[in-house]
């Protein structure tokens, strides 16, 4: 009797062990498959995020360069109109000169802060809007004036600065970008020369760059001159306080294209675009932290998906292991019934065989 009970317990353990082994194998295969697929999916998504961020930045830089070029072309056309259609065309003492000079300003006052014509000694000849020049102002010492005298064939673009030439009763400060050029002047019978000055409103550039930075989600864009001087930066306030640094001098040496650089131990992608005629550069920066944040968000999604999938497969594997081990359990029950003196037949259901086989004990 004890021997029969011992044999019964042994068979029960065998059945249990077989089901456990089947379930363990299925779980191991499932776990390895899910982890491998999750890792591959994560790596693929990480590469896709990196490429997408850089690709989007390249597209933004390209479209912004086109827009800035278009705006600056408009300003240059205003400058050329002032030079060739007014200064070169009319005597500076004529009413027609004053009329056309004023009209040109009025038509383009949304883009330019002022128009001015100076003689070769720095004397103010004409200005729009009409303004009183500040006392003791050294016009010839201004960068825009010196640049115009040093290279007389070119239109020179200054970096943004506060206009400081004229009195303003309201004490307003106007940020401008000065365009200047050495020009010939008609002054009666006496030919002369001087410097034509067009002060473009800084907002023409600032508004464009502010717009793309406001919607960039961590990626930022700034503009520098050919020698690395800052024209626009979204974090200029922090830079003025010493809370943020930008290596604009190094960036000024980059040619147009995309670069992978390391700054303070952090990797970042830099996209460089050239602004026509001025020598300025528009630079888009994709910090590593931006890509890391996006990847971390996806990492949580992957982890949650894997956990849900594992719970579903765990239940599925349990059902499959029960199904596979069912013939063995049925055989065990048949043997137990036979040993207990019940049925004289042992029922055996073979896997993959639809018709059961009965083994009769002789």
What is each residue range found by the language model?
Residues 351-362:
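Single conserved hydrophobic/aromatic residue that forms the stacking wall/gate
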Residues 98-108, 195-238:
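Solvent-exposed, extracytoplasmic
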Residues 178-181, 187, 192-202, 261-302, ...:
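Short, hydrophobic beta-strand elements of compact beta-sandwich sensory domains
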Residues 111, 126-199:
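Extracytoplasmic/periplasmic ligand-binding sensor regions of membrane-associated signaling proteins
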Residues 26-38, 302-313, 317:
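Alpha-helical transmembrane segments of integral membrane proteins
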Residues 1-47, 51:
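Extreme N-terminal signal-anchor transmembrane helix of membrane signaling/transducer proteins, especially
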Residues 3-4, 22, 39, 43, ...:
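Extracytoplasmic/periplasmic sensory segments of membrane signal-transduction proteins
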Residues 323-346:
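Membrane-proximal alpha-helical signal-transduction linkers
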């Amino acid at each position: 009797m004890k021997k029969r009970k011992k044999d019964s317990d042994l068979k029960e353990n065998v059945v249990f062990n077989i089901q456990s082994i089947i379930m363990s194998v299925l779980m191991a295969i499932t776990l390895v498959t899910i982890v491998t697929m999750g890792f591959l999916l994560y790596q693929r998504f990480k590469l896709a995020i990196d490429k997408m961020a850089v690709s989007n930045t390249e597209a933004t830089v390209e479209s912004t360069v086109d827009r800035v070029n278009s705006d600056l072309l408009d300003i240059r056309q205003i400058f050329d109109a002032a030079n060739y259609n007014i200064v070169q065309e009319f005597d500076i003492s004529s009413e027609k000169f004053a009329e056309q000079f004023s009209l040109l300003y009025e038509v383009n006052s949304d883009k330019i802060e002022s128009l001015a014509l100076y003689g070769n000694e720095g004397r103010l000849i004409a200005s729009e809007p009409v303004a009183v020049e500040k006392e003791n102002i050294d016009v010839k010492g201004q960068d825009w004036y010196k640049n115009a005298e040093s290279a007389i064939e070119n239109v020179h673009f200054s970096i943004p600065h506060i206009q400081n030439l004229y009195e303003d009763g309201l004490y307003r400060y106007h940020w401008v970008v000065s365009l200047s050029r050495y020009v010939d002047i008609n002054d009666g019978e006496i030919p002369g020369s001087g410097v034509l000055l067009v002060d473009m409103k800084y907002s023409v550039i600032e508004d464009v760059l502010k717009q793309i930075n406001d919607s960039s989600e961590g990626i930022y864009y700034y503009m520098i001159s050919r020698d690395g001087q800052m024209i626009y930066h979204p974090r200029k306030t922090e830079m003025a306080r010493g809370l943020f640094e930008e290596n604009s001098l190094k960036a000024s040496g980059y040619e147009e294209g995309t670069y992978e650089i390391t700054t303070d131990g952090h990797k970042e992608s830099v996209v460089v675009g050239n602004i026509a005629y001025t020598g300025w550069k528009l630079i888009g920066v994709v910090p590593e932290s931006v890509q890391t944040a996006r990847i971390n968000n996806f990492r949580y999604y992957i982890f949650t998906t894997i956990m849900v999938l594992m719970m579903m497969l765990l239940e599925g594997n349990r059902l499959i292991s029960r199904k596979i081990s069912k013939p063995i359990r049925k055989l065990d029950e048949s043997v137990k019934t036979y040993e207990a003196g019940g049925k004289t037949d042992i029922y055996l259901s073979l896997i993959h065989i639809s018709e059961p086989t009965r083994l009769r004990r002789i």
